[in-house]
Amino acid sequence: HLCLWIFPYIDENSKYFKEAEEKGFLVKNTKGVTSRFYSTATSTSKVGCFDFTNPHFIEWYKPKVRSVVSMGIGAVKTDFSEAVPEDAVYFDGSTGIQGHNKLTFLYAKTIYDIMAEVKIPLGELPMLWGRSGYAGSHTIPAAWAGDSSTHLNNHACILRGGLSASMSGIPFWGFDMGGFYNTDHEGYECVPTDEEYI
């Protein structure tokens, strides 16, 4: 089965950015303009965040994702959604702080609902790996722990996180076995040691 990766941001250089912005489908800032930010520390261009509190956006977005899922996609990994600035203002009036966790759930739920619409009529189960979550995330089948460090002491933290997730009702949970990246004492990414890698 093929698993696709998706994130809730759109690069400001994308040909679809202007359309989404003009339709009011991107999270705004307190000045009423699209909130643009760097999604990672190494990003070279800014992004806007899709506003999953806007029902008009959901109507516009679902057919686009559904068309891809209908090609036979077995699972979707919903990545990111935590980087929205605190001065954000969502369609439903939530501030960046109020909507921070709500966005992560609505994003995953939207994708999961699309998966269910496509998969259940085929007699298949929808599968979504969600990175971030909130109240209600237990209704989505699986959680992924995100980009974990390869340091051996980090494995204990990941295990605690997985146990906590299971106690919160999340039935399936996974992580990057052996870690995804390594950082040195200054916080710079570096190559894992042979022991950490294995």
Predicted segments, located by residue:
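Catalytic-domain carbohydrate-binding cleft regions of carbohydrate-active enzymes
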Residues: 1-198
